[in-house]
Amino acid sequence: MNDQTTGPVATEMLLRLDSVLSPTKMDLTDDSEQHRGHGGYNPAGESHFSLKIESAAFTGKSRVERQRMIYSALGDLMHERVHALSIRAAAPGE
């Protein structure tokens, strides 16, 4: 996990992903400041993220299936708090 991303939204995202997907590797970065002045930007931050995640749960799953699993794990955060999420999801060994 990434200790540099410690805001309340990022913390909740990491907890949910860890609980549902049991990742072997996970890195979540808050990219919000790079989107200042763009649509969905929140001055409070924590609106735009990049996620790199490796989980055995992704074995045999397509890219779209993996993204759906992540969105499902994040639930209401994707609708209420997170404007954009860039995802790199892999199974171990990929």
PLM segments and residue spans:
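N-terminal, polar/charged subdomain of small-to-medium soluble alpha/beta proteins
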Residues: 2-94
